[in-house]
Regions:
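Short, acidic, metal-binding catalytic loop of nucleotide-sugar glycosyltransferases
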Residues: 20-29
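A conserved acidic beta->alpha catalytic loop
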Residues: 21, 35-44, 57, 87
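Glycine-rich, basic loop-to-helix element that forms the pyrophosphate-binding segment
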Residues: 55-72, 80-82, 93
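Short aromatic/hydrophobic "clamp" motif used to bind/position activated sugar donors
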Residues: 77
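A recurrent flexible, glycine/aromatic-enriched loop bordering the glycosyltransferase active site
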Residues: 131, 135-140, 146-169, 188, ...
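A short, conserved alpha-helix in the catalytic core of glycosyltransferases
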Residues: 158-213
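Active-site-adjacent helix/loop segment of glycosyltransferases
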Residues: 205-293
Length: 315
């Protein structure tokens, strides 16, 4: 069984095309929809015959995915955003690639191309080929905004974007912390990078499969930060620090210190001046410092890969 997890929150405008792509997959899948208290027609569009978990409030992306994982039957789990469209062979090609790569590969992504509009109209621009990190602790989608070039082969990447990610169930079970696969403290945004980093620490790898193609409408990017809702920016600030506090070892922290400190000072200056709506992020981090450190201790205790082995991914 292959499980497809779809988290909705006022996603009606994208759902018809997204659901059509899932229905056209060349391999049978079970679809699990978790709705975070949508006020639009999302659930009506999903319709009958689909397992739906209805939340009375918006519990956040991470918690919603964990809810779906608790009932999913698949040995493979595809996480799909409502604003994504899968080509028919997407799931089948990713599974075949992971099977060939071996158990050390816990996650895979196809080539995500940029899409636009409610109808998820296709373009030839890259949206994501995976996740990469810089020495400043920032993470980006590999090749985002570049022109698509055919003829690529499968290759290893640091991690995969949660927009259209395939995970082995065995990988998700192995990296869970206190029963949570996706850390619910993240609520939304950067949780896929957190899972990717944790997976690396626990000895797993990730695969980019260019022959598996999907399309994704990218709505949250650094370029549009100033027009995003304040709550989005608040979670983004909170999670950029939470990501490192949990996963970064002392060697990487020392190696990357000049770059991270520069970036942190810029972010803090912005929060204290032009983006004061994100101040609650800093308060949250302080208030929850003991829980954060408890998670850090558990992750660092269970890690099997050293910072020195991971350092080449941060560049």
């Amino acid at each position: 069984v292959i499980s497809v997890v779809l988290v909705t929150w006022n996603s009606a405008r994208y759902l018809p095309r997204c659901l059509a792509g899932i229905a056209l997959q060349t391999i049978a899948v079970e679809l699990i929809v978790v709705d975070n208290a949508s006020s639009d027609d999302s659930l009506e569009i999903v319709g009958d015959g689909v397992r739906v978990i209805r939340n009375a409030t918006n519990r956040g992306f991470s918690a919603a995915v964990n809810q779906a994982l608790a009932v999913a039957r698949g040995q493979y789990i595809l996480l799909c955003n409502p604003d994504a469209y899968l080509t028919p062979t997407y799931v089948q090609r990713l599974i075949a690639a992971l099977e060939a790569a071996g158990e050390s590969y816990g996650a895979a992504t196809g080539k995500l191309l940029r899409a636009t509009g409610d109808a998820i109209e296709r373009t030839d621009l890259i949206d994501s080929k995976g996740i990469r990190f810089t020495r400043s602790g920032r993470h980006f989608d590999v090749a985002q905004g570049e022109i698509n070039v055919p003829g690529e082969t499968n290759r290893e990447v640091f991690g995969v974007s949660g927009a259209c990610a395939l995970y082995r169930r065995s990988f998700l079970n192995a990296v869970a912390i206190d029963g949570e696969v996706f850390d619910e403290d993240f609520f939304a945004y950067r949780e896929d990078a957190d899972l990717a980093w944790r997976g690396r620490l626990f000895g797993f790898r990730a695969l980019y499969v260019p022959d598996a193609v999907a399309y994704h409408v990218r709505t949250v990017t650094p370029e549009v930060r100033r027009v995003l809702a304040p709550v989005i920016n608040m979670h983004s600030v909170k999670n950029r620090f939470l990501l490192r506090l949990k996963n970064e070892g002392l060697y990487l922290a020392a190696r990357n210190a000049p770059f991270e400190l520069t970036r942190d000072l810029i972010a803090l200056a912005a929060v204290l001046t032009i983006e004061r709506s994100s101040l609650p992020a800093l308060a949250w981090l302080w208030k929850n410092r003991r829980r954060i450190m408890a998670k850090r201790r558990e992750i660092q205790r269970r890690r099997v890969v050293s910072d020195r082995e991971l350092a080449h991914w941060f560049r």
